[in-house]
Every structure is written in C-alpha cells, then in structure tokens.
Amino acid sequence: MIYETAPAKINFTLDTLFKRNDGYHEIEMIMTTVDLNDRLTFHKRKDRKIVVEIEHNYVPSNHKNLAYRAAQLFIEQYQLKQGVTISIDKEIPVSAGLAGGSADAAATLRGLNRLFDIGASLEELAQLGSKIGTDIPFCIYNKTALCTGRGEKIEFLNKPPSAWVILAKPNLGISSPDIFKLINLDKRYDVHTKMCYEALENRDYQQLCQSLSNRLEPISVSKHPQIDKLKNNMLKSGADGALMSGSGPTVYGLARKESQAKNIYNAVNGCCNEVYLVRLLG
C-alpha cells in the first residue's frame, strides 16, 4: 500500500494573455498550496482493472475522474501488467477553483510511481500529467510557482510569508471551460503578476495582499454576484486581501493573526456550507 496527500491550490494571480493556435489560452499565474488535503491510498491488483473508491455524490469513479485517467495514462506509459485500486478520502470541495481533481491526478502519478517502483522523475510525471490537465504539473510539485504556457511551464518561487487562509465556497459549481469561453482579451484588466512575484521574492506580506488579482473573477461574478458579496464580506471582516481562486466560485481571504482569521471565518460561515480555516503551505 502507498499513501499520498493531495493539497488544494489557490491562485495569487491569474492572467490570460492570448488565444493559442491549439485553442487554449496562454496563461500566466502564480499559485501556492494550502493545508486542505485529499488523501489517497494505492493498492496493486491481480487483474488489470483500475478501480476508484470514493464516497462522494458529485465525484465520478469512472474514466471521468482525473485520478482514474492519470492511472490509465501511467499504466499505458510504463506498460504495466497489473491494475490498481485507488481510494480517495475527499476534503477539497468539488468544482471549486481549488484544483481538487488535478491534485488527485498528480497524487496518483506520484503514488503509482512509488507503488510500481518506476523511478520516474517529478519532471517526467509533470510532463505526463500535462496531457490530461493544465493544473496537474503544478500539483506534481506542490510548491509556490509561476506557471505559464497552458500551465506546464513552471518557475519555482519563494514560499509565501506565513498566513492564515479562510476558504469559502458558495453553494454552486462553475465549469472552467465555460468561463474561459467568455474571456474578452480586448477588455483591459490589470493582473499584478510582477508585483506578486516581487512580493514573494522579498517575502513582503502587505505587497502580496495588494497584488492578488484574477482576470476570471469579473466574468464569474457577472454570472454569480454572490462571489463578489462573499469577497467584500471577507474584506469588511478584516481580511488583509481576498480573491476568487481559479475560475471560482471559492473565495479566500488572508489574515496574519489567528484571532483575525477566526473573525473572518465566523463572518462567512453562515452564508456558505463549505468554509475552511487553513494555513498557507507553498
């Protein structure tokens, strides 16, 4: 048996630069991890089946599950003769902008690499993972990073300053492809990637909070105004900075002090079913 942890990610910044010839957007984003985790265990099987065990109403256990697809890809790539049972204990909210599915897929690639003693490098696993998901290369490493291209080009950055994170997911799901289709690249939106990069370089917490920016946020807010209300609620309750992560709908707030973080947590706990008080990892 092999055990892997799959932490959630949040975006400090997210920008889309142009539409690529392959139909995807060229993206530029700075991401880090928080200590909200899915936990996965892996067992070899005597047959060649891939079995995903998960108790969650909204997460499939078939080929639509990214962990299943990662296992399928891994077994094909390394021509394995055995299948695997993957058990997922899910804590990361689903369709939330926190890369829960990608984190599980990345953990699956790392886990099978160990389970079958393949000895592939993390770089090799990241390249493999990029075939099925843009956030998977980042999730292979679980380090604070600037990600460009489709997300597969990674530059590691300093860990962020120590802080509390209040994560709140409104009671709705958002499809990332649907949000990306609505991007208007002619419309100006300032994303502070350089400011965030420098803030991490200098471990400047205040500058980090000022740099939080996401081009997808106004698009998701136009469809779901409660995202903006939630963000404003966090800021009014004392968050040093707040932002929607990914394509949403999860909003997070940053706080330096635990008492401050608990105030924000209590302020938003009544309006969302899924609220978490966690720490930055990076």
UniProtKB/Swiss-Prot annotation:
Binding site for ATP: 93-103
Gene3D superfamilies: 3.30.230.10, GHMP kinase, C-terminal domain (3.30.70.890)
Paired cysteines (S-S): none
A single GO molecular function term of this UniProt record: ATP binding
Top-level enzyme category: transferase
Catalytic activity field: 4-CDP-2-C-methyl-D-erythritol + ATP = 4-CDP-2-C-methyl-D-erythritol 2-phosphate + ADP + H(+)
Active site per database record: 9, 135
Function: Catalyzes the phosphorylation of the position 2 hydroxy group of 4-diphosphocytidyl-2C-methyl-D-erythritol.
Family to which this protein belongs: Belongs to the GHMP kinase family. IspE subfamily.
Protein name: Putative 4-diphosphocytidyl-2-C-methyl-D-erythritol kinase
Record lineage: Bacteria, Bacillati, Bacillota, Bacilli, Bacillales
